[in-house]
Amino acid sequence: MVYLTRKTTRGQHYFYLVKSFKYDGRVEKVQRYLGSEEPDEFELERLKQMHTNELELAAIERMAHMSSETYRTPYLDKEALLGLERMKFLNRAIHRLQTTDEKVREHAKNRVATIYGNMALSSNPLTYENIESIFDQDRAPSGLPLSKVLEVLSLRRLHGEISERVGRLGKRSILKLHQDLFEGTGKGGVLRENSANLPGSAFMPPPAILVEDELEGLLQWWHDPSPLHPFERAVLFHHRFQQVRPFESGNGLIGRLIMDGMLIRAGLSATEFSNYFFLVNLASNRIEPFEGKLQIPM
């Protein structure tokens, strides 16, 4: 809400445009000085049109600073945290200001981009145009195997549900997610029973007999209170999930899908972090390979 207010000091009037907003249960304000003369109704509307976006950004900056101070982390510096919080509050403001049609178009575009980014790291990835074509036609474009089409359609459905599913994340829900992704193939929803490796890495995942315990430990860590930023926690969860490698196949698709849900719940667009999925392949059991490579908007 943007409105005109007057302040009086030593008998002199000063006029400001003020935007009020709620943060953490309290009302905060940002303002812009207009001068000592009160604008008429026409001029006030012109000034509102001129300065509303500026005040909106000032409110976002204020909220980002206050919010970033609540996290304690060994991984991200202050500016990176601030950039993430700016992104979160900017996404929230854009969503509030968008029309219903704009939201629908953006959701459709982001869904294609996110699924393309997820599948780009899988074996036999599809092109962006392939995925768009499958979405438009709900059938296999010429030359594409039916299994890939079904995988894309499953990812489309699960992408719409993943935020809610991550809200109740547990071993059973992860198994169900894997089962739903590979529905009809007979290979979904079961923890691996054989040894595994990480392609291109010297790191060896835990033996099959320890997978269930490792997964339970990771989930316990996820649900424990933490001073880390949600983005960091999502990155660390994803990284460790890939190390555990709980399934015979589909670990990358499931891990990235879960991380998408974590980012969405944190108010961060999953499409902003597609580069992360390429960087994760550089790491074994360390976080250092990510430092300096994740580009956080400032």
Sequence positions of predicted segments:
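FIC/Doc superfamily catalytic core
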Residues: 2-249, 253-298
